[in-house]
Structures are given as structure tokens and as C-alpha cells.
Amino acid sequence: MKKVLFLLLACAAVAFAAEINAPVEQEAINVWIKAFSVLAAGLGLGVAALGGAIGMGNTAAATIAGTARNPGLGPKLMTTMFIALAMIEAQVIYALVIALIALYANPFIVLQ
């Protein structure tokens, strides 16, 4: 955790180290925004997919354990599991949509 925090602080220090009155071309700024958008989209989607995979694994494990304890509830638990899996997958799809918006319809890029 300390390494990640140090890396983020180092990136922030580089980002804020530019002179305030220095003339900067808008195209150069757009390149940096695009680069950081790709990084943010990749990291965000990766974290969402990791969380979704962990959630799906826990859901399946709990359903299997519940069915093993009470086989009569198997079909009911299976239905509930599929609903839960759909909700978990929806969250990952929402992260994908946000990542695609950040990549292809970025509101921070100034068009000339």
C-alpha cells in the first residue's frame, strides 16, 4: 500500500511541477489526457473485473455450500445465485462503459 501511495504522490508531484505561466500547447495537454485516460480505463476495468470475479466465486461457493447442507433448497438457491451473478456482472459492465467513455468520448480533451 505504501508503494502505491508513493507512486501516486510521485505522479502528482510531476503533474504539479509545471510552471503556471509557461506556455503549453493544447495538443500536448491532449496527449497527456489521452495517456492518463488509457491508464485510468485499464486500472478501473481491471479492479472491477477482479472484484466481480471474487464476488462471483464467493456467490458460487455459498450456493454450493447451501445446497450441500439442504438439497431441497437447491433450485431456489440456484435462482437466487443467478440473479446475484447478473447483478455482479452488471457492475463490471458499467465499469466497461465508463472506461469506453473515458477512452473514446473524453470530455476533457479540447477540440480545435
From Swiss-Prot:
**What PROSITE patterns does the record tag this protein with?**
ATPASE_C
Q: Where is this site: Reversibly protonated during proton transport?
A: E89
Q: Which CDD domains match?
A: ATP-synt_Fo_c (cd18121)
Q: What keywords sit in the KW lines?
A: ATP synthesis, Cell inner membrane, Cell membrane, CF(0), Hydrogen ion transport, Ion transport, Lipid-binding, Membrane, Transmembrane, Transmembrane helix, Transport
Does the entry feature the keyword Cell inner membrane, yes or no? Answer: yes
Chief subcellular location equals: membrane
| Membrane topology of this protein | Multi-pass membrane protein
- GO cellular component: a single term: proton-transporting two-sector ATPase complex, proton-transporting domain
Membrane spanning stretches: 36-56, 81-101
Q: Gene3D superfamilies, per this entry? A: F1F0 ATP synthase subunit C
- Spell out the molecular function terms from Gene Ontology: lipid binding; proton-transporting ATP synthase activity, rotational mechanism
Q: Where in the cell is it found?
A: Cell inner membrane
Q: Which family does it belong to?
A: Belongs to the ATPase C chain family.
Q: Give the function comment from the record.
A: F(1)F(0) ATP synthase produces ATP from ADP in the presence of a proton or sodium gradient. F-type ATPases consist of two structural domains, F(1) containing the extramembraneous catalytic core and F(0) containing the membrane proton channel, linked together by a central stalk and a peripheral stalk. During catalysis, ATP synthesis in the catalytic domain of F(1) is coupled via a rotary mechanism of the central stalk subunits to proton translocation.
Record text on subunit structure and interactions: F-type ATPases have 2 components, F(1) - the catalytic core - and F(0) - the membrane proton channel. F(1) has five subunits: alpha(3), beta(3), gamma(1), delta(1), epsilon(1). F(0) has three main subunits: a(1), b(2) and c(10-14). The alpha and beta chains form an alternating ring which encloses part of the gamma chain. F(1) is attached to F(0) by a central stalk formed by the gamma and epsilon chains, while a peripheral stalk is formed by the delta and b chains.
Q: Which HAMAP family match?
A: ATP_synth_c_bact (MF_01396)
Q: What is this protein called?
A: ATP synthase subunit c
The organism of origin for this protein: Campylobacter jejuni (strain RM1221)
Cite the source lineage. Bacteria, Pseudomonadati, Campylobacterota, Epsilonproteobacteria, Campylobacterales
